[in-house]
Amino acid sequence: MHFTQREQDKLMIVVAAEVARRRKARGLKLNHPEALALISDELLEGARDGKTVAELMSYGRQILNKEDVMDGVEHMITDIEIEATFPDGTKLITVHHPIV
């Protein structure tokens, strides 16, 4: 099986997001890469489910809060930009200040 670089990147996000979900479920605070992966994966899946860019930009700010992440992580992630596949093509989703 051969994956393109883009497919490998998306698989890495999925794996990191699953680790983050398990750690969050155990009550652990997420670090920077875990928080970024979890939010990114939720946005990618929302796009595949048919949500609009506007809906995902709003939803991206509801996934995690300051209590879910280690100290300072909310300041490290000021914006998330991810290219997602929608039913009508690929679009860029930008979420400003995703952890509030």
From Swiss-Prot:
Recorded metabolic or biological pathway in which this protein acts: Nitrogen metabolism; urea degradation; CO(2) and NH(3) from urea (urease route): step 1/1
Q: Which residues form a coiled coil?
A: none
UniProt keywords (A-Z) are: Cytoplasm, Hydrolase
Cellular component annotations (GO), alphabetically ordered: cytoplasm
**Subcellular localization(s) per the UniProt record:** Cytoplasm
Its EC number(s): 3.5.1.5
Cysteine-cysteine disulfides: none
Q: Does the keyword Manganese apply?
A: no
What is the top EC class of this enzyme, as a single word? hydrolase
- One annotated GO biological process: urea catabolic process
What's a single GO MF annotation on this record? nickel cation binding
Q: Does the keyword Hydrolase apply?
A: yes
Under the heading Gene3D superfamilies, the entry gives: Urease, gamma-like subunit (3.30.280.10)
Q: Which reaction does it catalyse?
A: urea + 2 H2O + H(+) = hydrogencarbonate + 2 NH4(+)
Q: What Pfam families does the record point to?
A: Urease_gamma
User: In which family does this protein belong, per the annotation?
Assistant: Belongs to the urease gamma subunit family.
Q: What is the protein's quaternary organization?
A: Heterotrimer of UreA (gamma), UreB (beta) and UreC (alpha) subunits. Three heterotrimers associate to form the active enzyme.
**The name this protein goes by in its record:** Urease subunit gamma
Q: What is the lineage of its organism?
A: Bacteria, Bacillati, Bacillota, Bacilli, Bacillales
